[in-house]
């Protein structure tokens, strides 16, 4: 497990056992989304204990990187999935109600870009910012 520190957030990168993270999806749904596609929070993990263990380890590492050493409970909200084909993408977005978020890459490579969510706040205050932030 490694910690990556940036100017706006710290990230944890860790290997997980994908065989222990098997899940099922209820109902038919599109696996590739954009902002106009209704998303269903419908994943059920076959081993939720392992998922929580991974999240706890990552959260503990993040909290330690900020020198935060206090007790907390971890609540895992409904989880959704994206499956991308060539040239698919997810528009940029924020998880404004969550303290932490995670991504599990099942196979392949990713062009994931993390942006400072403060930019959305600045855009709301200065909407005519000429695309520079």
Put a short name on every predicted segment:
Residues 37, 47, 76-77, 116, ...:
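Intrinsic-disorder/low-complexity coil detector
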Residues 81-133:
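Catalytic core of non-heme Fe(II) oxygenases with the double-stranded beta-helix
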Residues 68-79, 114:
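A short coil-to-beta-strand element that immediately follows conserved catalytic motifs
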Residues 8-10, 75-77, 98-100:
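Residues at beta-strand starts and edge strands
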Residues 1-72, 87-89:
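Non-heme Fe(II)/2-oxoglutarate
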